[in-house]
Design a protein with these regions (language model features):
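Histidine/cysteine-enriched polar flanking segments
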Residues: 1-173
Length: 173
């Protein structure tokens, strides 16, 4: 990523469609100072650790979604624990999942820790295809599976343990 004024429109590479794709750039945002990050608007999907091949796959949606699992960070319409379930449902439903209407809720959460540092949460996602022909709901338990040491800022070299989560007890309701 380059260090230019934010919100400066740039042209997409010549091999990518010119409409309705609109590419913007900025130096960085949020906590992702060390890897390119994308917010796909107006959908509100977050993607991380991108490279040109992955970006092209996202634009054309021409690879199996399983190849993109590690790049998908979640959808802005859901809470952090609901996003973990939503990613798994995307893996099951494929590209069509991104067009489904969704609503998420946290049913229960670890009372021993702060909400953003919970060791577990029970979540639910209700969904429907745009025409209503496919609809349903899933619940799951999200639990800590370990930690990863990460550097929060390029200004401070200290590493901090950050909880990593896994999906447990997935059930269609």
């Amino acid at each position: 990523m380059t260090h230019s004024p934010p919100h400066l429109p740039i042209s997409p590479p010549p091999h990518l469609p010119t409409s309705p794709l609109r590419v913007w750039r900025c130096s960085h945002f949020g906590g992702h100072n060390f890897a390119p990050t994308l917010i796909d608007l107006p959908e509100g999907r977050y993607w991380g650790h991108l490279d040109p091949d992955i970006l092209e796959a996202l634009i054309h949606r021409n690879v199996p979604v399983s190849q993109l699992r590690s790049f998908y960070r979640g959808w802005a319409g859901l809470g952090q624990y609901e996003q973990i379930l939503e990613r798994e449902l995307w893996m099951q439903f494929g590209w069509k999942w991104l067009s489904y209407l969704k609503a998420g809720q946290t049913l229960a959460i670890d009372p021993e820790n702060e909400e953003w540092e919970a060791d577990w949460a029970e979540v639910r996602i209700d969904y429907a295809s745009p025409d209503g022909a496919v609809q349903g709901a899933y619940t799951a338990r999200v639990e800590v599976s370990g930690t990863v040491l990460t550097q929060w800022s390029s200004k401070t070299p200290e590493l901090a343990a950050v909880k990593q989560y896994r999906l447990c007890e997935l059930a269609q309701v």
